[in-house]
Amino acid sequence: MQNKIKTVKELTVNMGPQHPATHGVLRLVLELEGEVIKKCIPYIGYLHRGVEKLSEDLTYVQSLPITDRMDYLSSMVNNVGFCVAVEKLMGIQIPERAKFIRTIMGEMARICSHLVWIATHALDIGAMTVFLYAMRDREYLLELFEMVTGARLTVSYPRVGGVRCDVNNEFLDKTYKFIEEFPRKVEEYETLIDRNRVWLKRTKGVGVISAEEAINWGLTGPTLRGSGVYYDVRKFFPYDAYDKVDFEVPLGKNGDIYDRYKCRMLEFRQSAKIIKQCIERLPDGSILAENALRIRMPESPLKIDKKDIIFDVYIEDKQIQEFIQKFTEVYASVEAPRGELGFYIVCDNSSKPYRMRVRAPSFVHAGVLPKLCEGSLVADVIANIGSIDIVLGECDR
């Protein structure tokens, strides 16, 4: 018998932009040789809303709500990042109570975001039960957000100079009760996953990023720390009340999908620890600085015109000039669930930013996908995307 020569057919396929496992409208063009990926080209921009350009026509107060729409899974952190940058620009010192409230809300948003991540990431790989457990617990936190802010996702709760409204004892009691029980819930997730042979096979040794590669790519957050690099904005450049609480920064060793997963699971416990300390140490006092930026409502509901609908800034241009110099620049960052979220603002002596640039961690992390996917199997693409936890609203802005 003559030996038949087997040829491997090369194929180009589109994954997305409507694929459910791309966690948004991400399109990947994959060049395959059999089941091995030879080339991976990510295409982004399908969810571009022009957040940076919109801010140039809005006042500092009016720009706040559009930051909600970037990473919509943790909008509270987006708001805080923008407020921290403007406060740094104008020299506004926020009250201690507002710092602790922001920290509580920020860590609750981190937990919410990580719950969506573990739910969808596990579901992508084949573990469905974790999805039900995680979304159950996230729903309770969203109800707590609604109790204080009136919204579940796009909250617009922080303000330049503090927070919009105070928290009451009912909210603090319910949050404290949840946080005390939450570590046991995290153990439930781990019990369902860590003994799953399919999960371990598809995460250990897959999607490896070395520490040097992670730094060179500009990765931050759990994706960077999973490679063993110690960097957390909350530790290196503390903001709000992070310099007044005790917490650890989880690190991985191998830089694979499993290590990135373990880092986020450990962050669950550290976030609970931070919230518990903040509630126990929450001081009394004001929630808004005296020189905070405010809006002026229309004087009479019977005299509303186009100008009144777009609220004027309470601190007018002349008052802003007391705080900033012409073309002052500032960069401030916060530790978002996905990594370092930075805001670079250029001011030109008016009540509107001359230029705002957002350093979105999802945008940076999307760039590492070719490195992760090329040379791996098609089935590993889904696991790799989930492990870096990108949100396309933040990536495309």
From Swiss-Prot:
Q: Which family does it belong to?
A: Belongs to the complex I 49 kDa subunit family.
Task: Kindly give the HAMAP family that the UniProt entry links to this protein.
Answer: NDH1_NuoD
The record, for InterPro entries, names:
NADH_Q_OxRdtase_suD (IPR001135), NDH1_su_D/H (IPR022885), NiFe-Hase_large (IPR029014)
Which Pfam families does the UniProt entry name for this protein?
Answer: Complex1_49kDa
Q: Which residues form a coiled coil?
A: none
According to the record's subunit comment, the protein's assembly and interactions are: NDH-1 is composed of 14 different subunits. Subunits NuoB, C, D, E, F, and G constitute the peripheral sector of the complex.
Where is this protein chiefly located? membrane
Q: What is this protein called?
A: NADH-quinone oxidoreductase subunit D 1
**Where in or outside the cell?**
Cell inner membrane
Instruction: State the source organism's domain of life.
Output: Bacteria
The organism of origin for this protein? Thermodesulfovibrio yellowstonii (strain ATCC 51303 / DSM 11347 / YP87)
